[in-house]
Amino acid sequence: MANVEIRVIGNDTYRVEGTVEESEKKLSDAARSGQSRLAWFKELASGEPVGINPAHVVSLRTV
């Protein structure tokens, strides 16, 4: 499976499981659901869930 790096405002990055397309869909779905809705991913480094606010995402890229 591909991995994606999500960069957010403040230059923090999260490496998560999935493809760019899957990540973009999760972020898009969360953005359409409301302002306080987070997109949930599994972080590669820790294996823990991480919630990301779609309004804070700067870029996505495959790693």
Name each model feature, range by range:
Residues 1-63:
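Eukaryotic intrinsically disordered, low-complexity regulatory linkers and tails enriched in Ser/Thr/Pro
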